[in-house]
From Swiss-Prot:
Keyword field: Cytoplasm, Endonuclease, Hydrolase, Manganese, Metal-binding, Nuclease
Compartmental location: Cytoplasm
Name of the protein in question: Ribonuclease HII
Cofactor binding note from Swiss-Prot or TrEMBL: Manganese or magnesium. Binds 1 divalent metal ion per monomer in the absence of substrate. May bind a second metal ion after substrate binding.
Residues holding a divalent metal cation: 7-8, 94
Gene source species: Campylobacter curvus (strain 525.92)
């Protein structure tokens, strides 16, 4: 039975979509790994090899959908969709929760199973490209560099400019208080 690897990118971001990818490889591809362990250049090279040598699907959940449904429900919907699209495959999701879908899970699967590593790369590269496009619309937020994650620069931009249309309004930023200047 073929393995269908599943992973997501953007889950913990403060802005932008979450991308969830599923991938069945037609042939082995050398160098697959957890996307976070690869350079951006290598991820892009592998992205093109993966898209040419696999059957894959990438699902995006907007910041509005994440705010309305929650991350768990978004992931549950993606996993159920992948069960239909990749019927007959053994589905393996990187993590420790299957969100009630019956999909198999494995912690650090993106570094252990090449199909999950491929899904990790598909999700990360596709989401990063979207965030670079948003950077052109909101250059003051620096999305090109931090991709919407809660870096110091991103938190400072939120303090200075407020949230924008791709901000996740439901995310509470712990230990973040805009500084107040006393006169």
């Amino acid at each position: 039975m073929q393995v269908c690897g599943i992973d997501e990118a953007g889950r913990g971001a403060l802005a932008g979509p979450m991308a969830v990818a599923a991938c069945v490889l037609n042939a082995g591809i050398s160098g697959l790994n957890d996307s976070k362990k690869l350079t951006p250049k290598r991820r892009k090279e592998l992205f093109h090899l993966i898209t040419q040598n696999s059957r894959y699907l990438i699902v995006y959940f907007s910041n509005e959908q994440i705010d309305e449904l929650g991350l768990s429900e978004c992931l549950r919907r993606a996993l159920n969709l992948f069960k239909l699209y990749f019927a007959g495959c053994e589905l393996l999701y990187d993590g420790n929760q299957n969100y009630g879908t019956g999909v198999q899970t494995m912690v650090k699967a993106d570094a252990k199973v090449e199909e999950v590593g491929a899904a990790s790369i598909l999700a990360k590269v596709s989401r990063d490209e979207l965030m670079c496009a948003w950077d052109k619309i909101y250059p003051n937020f620096g999305y090109k560099s931090h991709k919407g994650y809660g870096t110091k620069a991103h938190l400072e931009a939120i303090t200075k400019y407020g949230q924008n249309e791709i901000s996740r309004k439901s995310f509470v930023i712990k230990n973040f208080q805009p500084s107040l200047e006393l006169f």
